[in-house]
Amino acid sequence: RGGEVENIFIKDIDMKDIPAEAIMFGRYYMAKDPVALSGEKRELPKVELKPVDETTPVFRNFHISNVYCSGAEKGIFIRGVPEMHVKDIVLENMVLQSRKSIDVQEASNITFRNITLVSAETNPVVDVTQSDGLSFDKIKISEGSALFFRFSGGKTRNIQIKNTDLNKAKQKTSFELGAVEKELNVQ
């Protein structure tokens, strides 16, 4: 835990058969996975806010573009810590074929632009927890996906979706565990 990673530019990447996440930011080692296991009740992880110091991990100012991934456990996984979100990231021009698509936790000011998601598990395709200032522009998913976007947590705010056909999914959005629909702007 700790250290700064910032001002990184990555482009023109082809990946195949990635056993974990194709694109991953951050680690919060002490968090309970917010995905409920069989028989468990889904709830937000209990977190202990720590003061920001030299041990606080910092991930910010990334630009990743022109990525093709054929096979991964998860396409994009972003997980910050409550006291220091992963922030200021642009992810664009991607085709990601994976079991799960996008999982964002404790993140701020993230732009997802022109991304095609082909995922085996579609409930949800995009999962957002305790994050703010996210923009989803030109996101494409498979017709008949179960749930396009799931938003969780009372700190999930200022989410924008534009140029995206939400009707591809059986259910467009869900708001859980304190997330509210008024924080979503669909254009």
Regions of interest found by a model, annotated:
Residues 1-187:
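Extracellular/periplasmic carbohydrate-active domains that bind, remodel
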